[in-house]
Amino acid sequence: SLLAAVSKKIEYYDDEELDQFIGKAGDAYTEEETEMFRDVLYTTLDVEVAGWVRSLQLRGIELPDDLKDEVFLIIGERRNIEVKKADDR
């Protein structure tokens, strides 16, 4: 379907350097490597974080374990904001 094709299109978030981590396990990152992900995370708009995570998944890049809580907190807060906006309409 068209939607499936669109959702599989890989979008980069100025993070091409993370491609070096394709296939690396989430618990195998060094502190410096985790910081590379953190730098991208905190220069990405909150509304784009879910798309960034999807991009990483499509590219075969696992998030560092140390960063997963931060990422899911941001995505969760963003969803709460979207739900509140919908409720206010």
Where on the chain are the PLM-derived regions?
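Membrane-proximal, non-transmembrane interface segments of integral membrane proteins
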Residues: S1-G51
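Cytosol-/stroma-facing membrane-proximal "stalk/adaptor" domains immediately downstream
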Residues: Y29-R89
